[in-house]
Every structure is written in structure tokens, then in C-alpha cells.
Amino acid sequence: MSSEKQEGSPRRVLSLSDLVNREDSKDASGNTAGAALKPLSNDEVRRRLAHEDYSSNTASQVDDETDTDDGLGEVAFDRADFRFDFEGQERSGGRASGEAEAESGGPGHEKATQQPSDAIATSPDRESTEPRAMDIFEERASLESKKNNLRKDLRVLNEIASTARPGRYKVAPIWAQKWKPTVRALQNVNSKDLMKIDVSFTQVIPDDDLTKSVQDWVYATLLSIPPEQRQYVEVEMKFGILMDRSSDSQRVTPPVSSQTVYMEADARMKPDVDERVFVELNRYVKGISELTENTGKFNIIESHNKDEMYRAGINTQRPRFLRMSKDVKTGRVGEFIEKRRISQLLLFSPKDSYDVKISINVELPVPENDPPEKYMGQAPLNSRTKERISYIHNDSCTRIDITKVTNHNKGKRDDAEVTHEIELELNSQALLAAFDKIAQDSKDYATIVRTFLNNGTIIRRKLTSLSYEIFEGGKKVV
């Protein structure tokens, strides 16, 4: 009877609280959950099943109402992230049909009641791990909350920016830095590369204004000389002091601070230097000529001559001045010429002790029908005895004459005057060769004149330094 009674009575279904109590009792006592559970009455089972059926129907009705368009909510179908959870719908539908079969007592109900307790206990965990589709209204609410949070953050940042003081920069920003030129000439140039610097961006060294003026003056003067007389041209440079014509003892003082061309109408040159400076300069030039690197570059010539000046010509004609040069030791006539002055250029040097006179003359040979013997019995206008040392430097086309001159006025030794003259003479043949081809190439002509002026600058500055050393006590000359 008891077995039949048990078979006729329905099996008890475990509720969620039973499962939880089962797990707790299992952990506490260590016994199985089936032994601790108490059977429920039939009325209690029917009441719980009716309650679960009502809750499932209510959920389906809510879902049906959500799918309609009659409610107050709006469904944003145009959203790109909108999706419908078909798998979840199928699972919920299958769950509802299974509960209906269990209530009607069909085969599905028996199968559900025959499942082991372990599988029933693990079913809530499986459902909790399955992804749940987010409702579109919840998603919209989350987006709105994110936007509101962003607005709040921006509002707070704006308030901080408006009230906070600007911080100090470790490195000043570009708008607060001082302007620096992007192009800096000769910056970061290695000292070893200085030897490779170009003379100019055109690879040409331009002549200064004074050099250009002298070049033009020499060219114009040579052009004015008849071609047949150019071969007798003499270009020489002398050093002395420019004297004012109104006073023979005062040097001119124009308002200039550098070497410049001075008008010859306002001054005259006195070609003379101090004797001690004269001796020291001779020693200086001789020392340069004896240097090892200058071996063979200098030719040294010593001479002792006497020059006599004669005036020739009829009173109705232009007078001619003839110069007769004799060797003092032998008395032999070495040169008999007619010297004509063509032009001269005075250069005033306010920073130096001596000034410069550049003169261009023509030394024409006297015709054979007018021999020197013709003037032997005449008294010369003046005579000059010259003790000269000449240093000829062919590489620069320059001859340096260091001459001690004794002037005899009207041939009387009693009125002798001793002067010390420094003179540079330009090689006439080299100058004329460059002058003849100046139309094809003017570089040679400009180079010759420039080199001549450079040699004159070296001598002039050396004379000045020697003068300072002698007269200011820097050097004692015996």
C-alpha cells in the first residue's frame, strides 16, 4: 500500500530557497541535500506552480507592451548599435513552454522532474553567465548620463582655467622668446676652415677707392703720352713731407683721417727723411733680401754718380733740361737724357710720418747731334752727388732706391745740402706690356699698379714705425 501510495502522489519540485538551504545545509553538516529536505504538501506545490505561471505570463505581457508603439517611450530604430536578441527570445519562449508542460503534467514535466539535483543546482549559474541584451532605453539613458558627465567635467575645467594663475614655464614659449636671426654669418665655423674662406662671394678682391684712383690716373697719363715716347716712361714714388706753399716749414693739415689724394696746387713735396730712419730702413730692406726664402729674388746694385742739369734751347723755344750722369770714380758719362715731367699725384697720409708723391716722367735720350761734350764747358744749373743702393725685386716689378744725396747749388760745394731719399720705381716694360693689352684683359694692369702701391704702403708704414721707435724712446739708434 505504501508503494502504491507513493507512486500515486506527485513528486515534490525544489524551489530556489530549497536549493539555497540545501547548499547551506550541505556545507554545515556534510550530508546530502536530499536527506535534509522535507517533502511539501500537494497544496503547497500547486500554489507555487500557479504563482510561477502567473509571473511568466506577466513578463510576456510586459514584453508584448514593450514591442508596441503605443507607449510613451520612443524606439530609435535608426541607431547603428540597435540589435534584437533573437537567441534570448527563443530561450525565454522555450522556458515558458517547458513550464506549461510541467503544469499540465505532460512528458516534459516528467522529464524535468527526473533531472538530478546537481544539474538543477547548477542551472542558475549557467543562466547568470549568459550575455543579456541591453535594452535600448537603458542604453539611451547611459549615453545621456555620459554626456551629462562630460558637460560637468568641461564646466569644471573652464572654471579652473578662468580662476587659476598661469604657471611659470621652465622653457619660455616661442612667442615669449627674444628674436634670433635664422641666418648667422660665419657661425660655427671651424678655425681649420678659415684658410678655405673665399676672398669674396664673387671670388674677386675689389680695389679700394685710392688704389682705383691711382690706376685711373696712371692709365690716363700713359694714354696722353705719344706712343713713340711711351717706352721712355718712368713711374716713381718718393717719400717726404707735404709742405704748404704759404709756409715752407709746416705740413699740410687737411680735415681727413686716412690717406687721400691732395691737390698739388696747394702743396709741394720735400723728398727727405730723417737720417736715422734712413739707416734703419736700409738695414730692414737688406735683412729681407738676405732671408733664405728670398734667395735669388733680389738684385742689389750699389752706385756713386754725379748728376748735372743743363738748360738747352733758344729763348724763343721751349726750354729743355738735360741731365748728365757721370761715375764719380772714373768720370765716365753713363747717361745723357732729357727729362720731361708729365704729371704727379700727391698722397697725404695723416696717420703716418711721411707722405707720398707719385710722378710720371719721360726720359728721352739726347740726339747724337747734341753730344755731352758740347756741354762740358758750361756751368750746370745744379749738380747732385748720389750714393745709392738699389734693391731690385723682379717678382713685384719694383726697384727700391735708398739714396744719400748731396745738392750743390750752381756747382758750389760750399752750399751743399745733404738729403736722404727713399724712392720706388716701377718696371716700365711690364707696365707698358699690361697697358697695351688692357682692352683684352685689364687684370694684369690692375695687378701691377696695385702691387706697386702695396710695396709703397709697406715702406711708408715701416718709416712711421721706425720714427716712433726713434723719437719716442722705443729704440736707441747709435
From Swiss-Prot:
Main location: nucleus
Organism, as annotated: Eremothecium gossypii (strain ATCC 10895 / CBS 109.51 / FGSC 9923 / NRRL Y-1056)
Enzyme class: hydrolase
Descriptive protein name: mRNA-capping enzyme subunit beta
EC annotation from Swiss-Prot or TrEMBL: 3.6.1.74
Catalytically driven reaction(s): a 5'-end triphospho-ribonucleoside in mRNA + H2O = a 5'-end diphospho-ribonucleoside in mRNA + phosphate + H(+)
Feature: compositional bias, Acidic residues: 62-72
GO molecular function, one term: polynucleotide 5'-phosphatase activity
Keywords: Hydrolase, mRNA capping, mRNA processing, Nucleus
Record localization: Nucleus
GO cellular component term, pick one: mRNA capping enzyme complex
Complex and partners: Heterodimer. The mRNA-capping enzyme is composed of two separate chains alpha and beta, respectively a mRNA guanylyltransferase and an mRNA 5'-triphosphate monophosphatase.
Species lineage: Eukaryota, Fungi, Dikarya, Ascomycota, Saccharomycotina
Cofactor requirements of the protein: Mg(2+)
UniProt function note: First step of mRNA capping. Converts the 5'-triphosphate end of a nascent mRNA chain into a diphosphate end.
